[in-house]
């Protein structure tokens, strides 16, 4: 049997020739495009290969470019789908959309969100904008409308992005936080209420257009007092209590404490133990009023008071005032009434004193009103005596017995000192007032102040007293000149008198006198000048200079003799010990028994200090042989004092 001849199976793959491969290498992109266009595909339904449209990526997702083509495709699809079940489903979907409309809105919202996401993410790849194929500038110049549309789209997207940025994203929410922390004033609260009502009405109008809402506007000034108080209670309930306490404190200060303190300062009222208490209470009330006013000021300005130290200050002062109120209860029951009476009496006495000071003084008025004023004066004197007695009783109760004894001793000592002339002069004030300093030139004195010189008559005593109170003493007016100078002796004469007084004080008696006056004190220059010829100390008739020098020499000798007596040293010789009949006193038995027991030692060694000194000197001499002394150069080189030893080397070995 012969073999059946078989046929060779050829592969369906088209084998490329060498010529085709070479041509493909030299083909350009344009040549490849034209070759691809000329090829007719055999499998029409084969869409496995990717089309060029899939490679296209939109740069700007512009609306209205391909909308018409898409709508046409949608309508064609719907017409095809109407046949059969799909048509029924589409109709059912349309019916539901028309009836409810919720799903359509939700889908529309989802589509809008997707579109916004697409718009916000345009131009994600920068490579799409470079190395484009559109090299023809004529084509670019023809698309001016597209470029304008792109610019508008960019501007719109940027505006949307900027609009979405809030103040919190930029870090500018500090001001809003500070405004929220700050407490609002009454006007801001009312404005805020108006804005809130407006926003509520706007929301209601947007939500339901059919319903009509009326706006309510509130003005605090137009409200009644009760409504205003309700607003105050709601915003700051503590203000009302603080205002009432402020009014009470101010009233207490003005009506009770300040008048009493003024009287105490003037000295019209004497409160021994209660003055300090009233001062403390006045200070506390003043600080409390100050703190309340500061709190109200902060509240009116709208500043935050939540953590302010004025609150702690108010609480502290309030606690102190409560403690003082407890002390008020411990005061005697009639204390306030007595204070009021004392204030009234002080005011009346002050008015009477002012009337007395301002009343005109004249002899005729005093004589006329003297008889009528006697009973009033007697009554006033009795009242003053009663008051003095009460004050003395009160003082005696407070002062202890020991303090009274000390005061008595002090008064006795002062009296003794006055009598001796140590503390003050014994001359009374009335005598001093009567003595006036007389001028040397009484002729030049002007007597235009004759009213001040009161007469010593007994019938005009009241006028004299009032003139002392009201009028002030005026110095007599004089005319300046050489006549005002006092007449004095020559300087030589005054010097001689002074030396005579010094000699008399030293104890040297002169022939002219003692140099003392009648009272025993040394006379002054003014007394010598005033006495003149009546001076007994000086004899102006027969006095020579030789006698004066003799007196001075005697004075010096007397002074030297007195100094010699004081400072001289007399040799006082101590008497030797008395010797007995048998000679000097004998030593004791112990001394005799101990004699000869101590051995004889070297003088340099038995004293430790001397011993150590000798040892030190030996060490110093031995040290000189080891280390040579440093000798300073005193002059030019004079050779070696001890000779040159060639064996010694003073150099330093390296």
UniProtKB/Swiss-Prot annotation:
One GO cellular component term: ribonucleoprotein complex
GO BP field: chromatin organization; rRNA processing
Residue ranges with Acidic residues bias: 44-56, 64-82, 103-114, 171-181, 524-546
Segments of skewed composition (Polar residues): 588-599, 645-654
Oligomeric and partner information: Interacts with NUCL1, NUCL2, JMJ14, NOF1 and MPP10 in the nucleus.
Function as written in the Swiss-Prot or TrEMBL entry: Essential protein during embryogenesis. Involved both in gene transcription regulation and in processing events critical for proper rRNA biogenesis and nucleolar organization during reproduction; contributes to pre-rRNA processing at the 5' external transcribed spacer. Binds RNA.
Name of protein: Protein THALLO
């Amino acid at each position: 049997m012969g073999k059946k001849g078989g046929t060779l199976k050829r592969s369906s793959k088209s084998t490329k020739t060498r010529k085709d491969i070479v041509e493909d290498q030299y083909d350009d992109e344009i040549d490849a495009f034209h070759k691809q266009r000329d090829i007719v595909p055999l499998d029409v339904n084969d869409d496995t290969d990717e089309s060029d449209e899939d490679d296209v990526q939109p740069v700007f997702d512009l609306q209205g470019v391909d909308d018409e083509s898409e709508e046409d495709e949608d309508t064609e699809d719907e017409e095809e789908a109407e046949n059969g079940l799909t048509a029924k489903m589409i109709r059912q979907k349309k019916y539901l959309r028309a009836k409810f409309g919720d799903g359509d809105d939700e889908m529309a919202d989802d589509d809008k969100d997707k579109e916004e996401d697409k718009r916000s993410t345009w131009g994600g790849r920068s490579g799409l904008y470079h190395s484009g194929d559109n090299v023809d500038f004529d084509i670019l110049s023809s698309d001016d409308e597209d470029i304008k549309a792109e610019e508008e789209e960019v501007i719109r997207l940027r505006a949307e992005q900027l609009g979405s940025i809030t103040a919190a994203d930029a870090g500018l929410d500090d001001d809003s936080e500070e405004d929220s922390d700050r407490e609002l004033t009454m006007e801001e609260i009312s404005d805020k209420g108006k804005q809130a009502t407006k926003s509520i009405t706007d929301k209601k109008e947007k939500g339901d257009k059919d319903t009509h809402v009326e706006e309510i506007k509130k003005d605090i000034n137009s409200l009644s007092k009760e409504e205003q108080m309700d607003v105050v209670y709601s915003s700051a309930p503590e203000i009302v209590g603080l205002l009432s306490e402020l009014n009470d404190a101010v009233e207490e200060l003005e009506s009770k404490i300040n008048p009493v303190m003024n009287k105490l300062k003037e000295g019209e009222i004497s409160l021994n133990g209660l003055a300090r208490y009233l001062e403390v209470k006045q200070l506390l009330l003043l600080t409390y009023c100050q703190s309340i006013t500061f709190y109200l000021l902060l509240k009116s300005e709208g500043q935050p008071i939540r953590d302010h130290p004025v609150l702690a200050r108010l609480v502290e002062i309030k606690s102190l005032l409560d403690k003082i109120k407890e002390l008020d209860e411990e005061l005697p029951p009639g204390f306030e009434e007595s204070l009021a009476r004392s204030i009234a009496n002080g005011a009346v006495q002050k008015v009477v004193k002012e009337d007395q000071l301002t009343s005109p003084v004249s002899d005729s008025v005093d004589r006329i009103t003297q008889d009528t004023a006697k009973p009033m004066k007697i009554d006033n004197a009795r009242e003053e005596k009663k008051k003095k007695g009460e004050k003395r009783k009160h003082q005696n109760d407070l002062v202890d017995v020991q303090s009274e004894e000390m005061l008595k001793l002090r008064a006795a000592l002062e009296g003794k000192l006055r009598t001796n002339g140590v503390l003050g002069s014994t001359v009374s004030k009335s005598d001093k007032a009567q003595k006036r300093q007389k001028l040397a030139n009484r002729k030049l004195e002007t007597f235009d102040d004759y009213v001040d010189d009161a007469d010593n008559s007994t019938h005009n005593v009241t006028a004299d007293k009032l003139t002392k109170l009201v009028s002030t003493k005026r110095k007599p007016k004089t005319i300046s000149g050489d006549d005002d100078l006092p007449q004095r002796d020559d300087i030589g004469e005054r010097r001689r008198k002074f030396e005579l007084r010094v000699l008399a004080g030293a104890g040297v008696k002169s022939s002219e006198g003692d140099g003392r006056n009648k009272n025993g004190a040394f006379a002054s220059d003014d007394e010598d000048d005033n006495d003149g010829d009546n001076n007994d100390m000086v004899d102006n008739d027969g006095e020579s200079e030789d006698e004066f020098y003799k007196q001075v020499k005697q004075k010096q000798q007397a002074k030297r003799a007195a100094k010699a007596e004081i400072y001289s040293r007399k040799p006082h010789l101590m008497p030797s010990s008395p010797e007995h009949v048998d000679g000097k006193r004998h030593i004791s038995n112990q001394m005799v028994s101990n004699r000869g027991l101590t051995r004889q030692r070297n003088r340099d060694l038995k004293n430790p200090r001397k011993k150590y000194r000798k040892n030190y000197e030996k060490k110093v001499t031995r040290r000189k042989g080891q280390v040579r002394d440093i000798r300073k150069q005193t002059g030019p080189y004079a050779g070696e004092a001890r000779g040159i030893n060639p064996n010694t080397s003073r150099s330093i070995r390296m």
